Amino acid sequence: MKKQGKYMLNKLPQLQYTLTPNSVNPAEAVDYINSHIENYYCETMSVDISYMNILDACRVSTLCSTQHYIKYPNGKITWKVSSDSVKEFNKDLELGNSEYIL
């Protein structure tokens, strides 16, 4: 008879790095970031979208923050953006998991 072992799942340590989407197309950037959220443990993450224009940055940060909130309700995303206008534009859509830095 084979003895069954007990296994515990441990959280992997959080890596500290900045994720930069490899596309200026906002739909592709959303897919890239959301894929990262789904496939990796990233309760706290940092994303650089400072190369995007204001409207694209608003779209990407809103859609991906929502996806991140669904998986990690207590998580946080730090968005590196090119303008304070992104934060102002998204303030009414905020879920409490986003921080914007210049």
What residues fall within each predicted segment?
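STAS-like cytosolic regulatory interaction modules
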Residues: 1-58, 64-102
